[in-house]
Amino acid sequence: QVNFTPGW
């Protein structure tokens, strides 16, 4: 499981 949280 890959979680990507952008900062925008």
Swiss-Prot record:
A cellular-component GO term for this protein: extracellular region
GO BP field: flight behavior; neuropeptide signaling pathway
Tryptophan amide, modified sites: 8
Key words of the record: Amidation, Flight, Hormone, Neuropeptide, Pyrrolidone carboxylic acid, Secreted
Highest taxon of source: Eukaryota
Keyword Glycoprotein among UniProt keywords: no
Modified residues (Pyrrolidone carboxylic acid): 1
GO molecular function: hormone activity
Keyword flag Secreted: yes
Intracellular or extracellular location(s): Secreted
The family this protein is said to belong to: Belongs to the AKH/HRTH/RPCH family.
Function: This hormone, released from cells in the corpora cardiaca, causes release of diglycerides from the fat body and stimulation of muscles to use these diglycerides as an energy source during energy-demanding processes.
Protein name per Swiss-Prot or TrEMBL: Adipokinetic hormone
Organism: Namaquaphasma ookiepense (Gladiator bug)
Higher taxonomy: Eukaryota, Metazoa, Ecdysozoa, Arthropoda, Hexapoda
